[in-house]
Amino acid sequence: MEKIYSVSEFNRMVKSYIDDIDDFQEFFIEGEISNITYYKSGHLYFSIKDSKSQIKCVAFNYKLKRIPEDLKEGDLVKLFGDVGFYEARGDFQVLARYIEKQNALGSLYAKLEKVKEKLTGLGYFNEEHKKDLPKFPKNIGVVTALTGAALQDIIKTTRKRFNSINIYIYPAKVQGIGAEQEIIKGIETLNKIKEIDFIIAGRGGGSIEDLWAFNEEEVAMAFFNSKKPIISAVGHEIDFLLSDLTADKRAATPTQAIELSVPEKESLLEDLKAREIYITKLLKSYVDSMKRELLLRIENYYLKNFPNTVNSLRESIVEKEIQLKEAMESFIEQKRNIFENKIDKISVLNPINTLKRGYTVSQVKNKRIDVLDDIEINDEMMTILKDGKVISVVKEKIYEKNIN
């Protein structure tokens, strides 16, 4: 008969197992400090990591132990302690007894400084390499995690500012193993799409190691080599990442990236109206000035002797005023029609409007379905409608031979 444990029984068994293994007690471990927090209670919580793994650590009453009080993110240390298992939460951690600094800067930061020096020497951070963002973008490319808050912030802010802009999304890992390659591939792929006006690559906030992919030299060079203008939009305020320095523009958050690059539709319309008012006033001022000048000439003795000439000039003034007014009204109406026509064309391309016309989009595992071979029986399928989503399970696939 199978043994079934309660959660408490299982955790108690694990703790007993760990406590009985000598190798889990009184050992040294070397790594880099991360996510460090000093508490007023006298306890110190942090992680220690290398290039592949990390483990949680705690030092209770650290002031009573041989533990430095100035440890910081990135410090390389040697730690002496024991494995601890917190039974109530099932947490596995190292209980630090002694910590010794191995280097003032962690290996990652030391490597980063070398890369910064190298790229600075090559002039890759210079303003002369920065490309300007387009004033009126129609299509934006985004490289970020498909399920992250960053993407939702970008979509929400774009729809609020100019809802007919199209967003091309390249889903990519933004932390962990393989993140660098996916970010680079995303930038390269979006650069090949002619319609895209500029690219945003980034993510929401996190610990420094979560953001570290954007500090890798290869990723920074992908930003620098982008043929299209590119914004580094990583959610952090403390320091500049390497991608911030090689990108054409840096934004502290994905939301700010949209605010920097996408104009507000209402502001554009207000600006157009203000320009219309300004041109109308300018025209009126010019006509009034001409009136005054000609009236002064009329009063001149020489012109008084030629009433026919004066009358002709007066009629010319009235005629020119009418012509100028009609020309200005025609010009303003033409520009307004051009602007409204462009807005209508952009709105037609909006995928949201396609949904409103009754069409749907189906996805399996966050990938769009184009043909039946993209799905399998019992796949969970999400169908996007104009007012929501439907989750269904594929029970049967029916191929239609008469469909081109």
Swiss-Prot record:
One of its GO terms (biological process) is DNA catabolic process. It comes from the Bacteria. GO terms for molecular function: exodeoxyribonuclease VII activity; nucleic acid binding. GO terms for cellular component: cytoplasm; exodeoxyribonuclease VII complex. It is found in: Cytoplasm. Its main location: cytoplasm. Gene3D superfamilies: 2.40.50.1010. InterPro entries: Exonuc_VII_L, Exonuc_VII_lsu_C, OB-fold_nuc-bd_dom. The keyword Cytoplasm applies. Keywords: Cytoplasm, Exonuclease, Hydrolase, Nuclease. Its EC number is 3.1.11.6. Pfam families: Exonuc_VII_L, tRNA_anti_2. It catalyses: Exonucleolytic cleavage in either 5'- to 3'- or 3'- to 5'-direction to yield nucleoside 5'-phosphates. It is an enzyme of class 3 (hydrolase). Bidirectionally degrades single-stranded DNA into large acid-insoluble oligonucleotides, which are then degraded further into small acid-soluble oligonucleotides. Heterooligomer composed of large and small subunits. Belongs to the XseA family. HAMAP family: Exonuc_7_L (MF_00378). This is Exodeoxyribonuclease 7 large subunit. The gene is xseA.
